[in-house]
């Protein structure tokens, strides 16, 4: 869910999403992935693994990847105390007495911290009603919670900070055309391979997206030459035995997406 939403978020900003990875709750794997992605890409986002339980190890793993300590962040703790709503089963909880619940909560505001950097460069509060910050490590790794509602709200809050860095803010020079097809991926693969080779020099990318359990699949054209892309519409509709649509799923009542 978060990956799909993030892909649309990137497209809306004109960000070319290069890679999505699913990493196990394994410290060595997280360290390797964080270092590699940070070295290869300008903007890296992680989702999940920052809760109170033993298997929430994103903060500690990324801290170790860059030899950083985990530091109890005073402002994050202050916001947590002010904004957290106690659950009925936690009515006996108090911040004044050490307890497993207190230690678990404090764990969520112990952040990777570089003492050589300004606080505002590495701890970002992007929503007034959320205590959870975006922890930024190595300048480009942005650590988010995995809960979709929080992930989406915080990325939306981060948008004003991202826009000044973009060559094409809000993707205004990037166009996308969607096609709905009843054919399985195997049924359009040959045509799309040929099409991709033909349009690559024009900077147009061809995509195929199976929609599991749905009646139709999606084919996309993405690029900046709108006139050229529009000239391809009839050819693509014929090649995929489908039609142009404005959004995925608008004609799900027709066709089949199953290979035979």
Segment roles from a protein language model:
Residues 139-237:
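An accessory alpha-helical subdomain
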Residues 4-65, 85:
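N-terminal small/polar loop signature for handling phosphorylated ligands or for N-terminal nucleophile
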Residues 239-260:
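Conserved short beta-strand edge segments in small beta-sheet-based binding/regulatory domains
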Residues 1:
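Glycine-rich, flexible N-terminal cofactor/catalytic loop recognition
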Residues 16-19, 116, 205:
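Conserved beta-strand segments of alpha/beta enzyme cores
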Residues 22-25, 75, 183:
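Short beta->alpha linker loops
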Residues 57-166:
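Proline/glycine-rich low-complexity loops and linkers
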